[in-house]
Amino acid sequence: MPSPIQVTDFSFEKEVVNSEKLVLVDFWAPWCGPCRMISPVIDELAQEYVEQVKIVKINTDENPSISAEYGIRSIPTLMLFKDGKRVDTVIGAVPKSTLTNALKKYL
């Protein structure tokens, strides 16, 4: 069963920027209630889009450099990267349909 990949400040470039697939990045923290609410949705997307999309999670508390680089001010923040560039951002615990529609735009 596919699940999101945990990335760090050190693995972000390899896993996200250099990925040949579309990448959904979930910026989260363990103390964040809305992050915990959206986590099952992220897990479902990881299963449904296993062939087309790489889904990664980055803990903002443990990885402040990447969070600062991308201007993360509130969490959860979800960003889509295509060909190494950020192409879309969704902030907050949104419905699965919102994320699905965002993914479909770039597939």
UniProtKB/Swiss-Prot annotation:
UniProt-recorded Gene Ontology molecular function terms: protein-disulfide reductase activity
Thioredoxin domain sequence ranges: 2-107
InterPro entries: Thioredoxin (IPR005746), Thioredoxin-like_sf (IPR036249), Thioredoxin_CS (IPR017937), Thioredoxin_domain (IPR013766)
Function: Participates in various redox reactions through the reversible oxidation of its active center dithiol to a disulfide and catalyzes dithiol-disulfide exchange reactions.
Designated gene of the protein: trxA
Family, similarity comment: Belongs to the thioredoxin family.
Disulfide pattern: C32-C35
Site (Contributes to redox potential value): G33, P34
Protein name (database record): Thioredoxin
Active site: C32, C35
GO cellular component, one term: chloroplast
Organism: Cyanidium caldarium (Red alga)
Locations listed in the record: Plastid, Chloroplast
Pfam families named among the record's database cross-references: Thioredoxin
NCBIfam families listed in its UniProt record: thioredoxin (TIGR01068)
Database matches in PANTHER family: GEO12009P1 (PTHR45663:SF11)
Residues under site feature: Deprotonates C-terminal active site Cys: D26
Keywords of this entry: Chloroplast, Disulfide bond, Electron transport, Plastid, Redox-active center, Transport
Keyword Electron transport on entry: yes
